[in-house]
Amino acid sequence: MKLTLEDISKNSEQIFYNLRWNGEIACPVCGSVHVYNKDAGKLHICADCQTRFSDTSGTIFHSTKLSLSKWLYAIYLFLTSTRGISSYSLARYIHVSQSTAWTMLMRIRTCLGQDIKFDSTDVVAIDEMYLGANWAYKPGFKKYRQAGSPPAFYNLNEKDRKSWYKKKFYELAAEDKMAILGMVSLGGPRRARISLIYINTPERKDFVKRAVLSRCASIMKPFFVDTPMTIVTDQSGLYKFLEQELDHNNQPRFNHQICRHDQNKYASADGYSSNRLEAAFSHIRRSWRGVYQFWTRTYNQLYLNEFCFRYNNNLSDKSVTLKRLQDFFSRVDPRAAVHFA
């Protein structure tokens, strides 16, 4: 069953009621279904713990002054936009201010947590990307090129000069970019899934190790599975720990496949490639530049969760199923702190 814009405009309250309770009202505190109504059904009282709650209690719609039709319309646009929707565009569509639209979108994103676990049947590609301004457009780059060239620089050809510029300036500008760790499944019985994590610490090696092991090594292999989990990376030193991890039989836990990008080789010796993850990174850059123009480090993980939700749920079609819409009515308090791995 699909939900249309006409349904949202006419029966928003009934749609919300049906999706929130699914035919049976339950207390958000103790979970009891022994509930009686008050004020013509607008207020519910739990018979066990005496908690008073409404249909919007414990959701992102709690204490809102906007109509439910605008909220449902905002979620509809959020889900059906291929690369996301900016707060300015949403404000024009539902006739609210830009700050109100931004708050609505951020509340929606708080429901999009990542709970991705890869098992031994998956082939996982891991890579990192750095989101930020192009190194050639950074302030002071031309001055650095003029003053920072070594004497041997003038003996290099044009191609090697550009490589030297790029390498040296990346070292200076790396701290200004947002480092993102990406993991995507390349094969297996299930559909491809992706997990994106914002690296918000200078200790990147330790952070990457904890993040990878929490999603790939936390699920122990069955005893009858002798083949290690295959992980595909580039030649970066961030992933050397994969060759040192052992399982309960003191055997390598991972089959580490390396794509030598520095040698212009984009597939490992066994034919594995990380191009699917590179394609996902290109979509993130297009959203960052074309839709949102910019977002701060503070909310970087929320935007990454949004991208993962689109990728993992295949929201390319222009329709919203009731099951997808019901995910936003989970008991999430937007005023609580949101923590990420």
Regions found by a protein language model. Name each.
Residues 1-341:
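Residue-level recognition of single "structural anchor" positions
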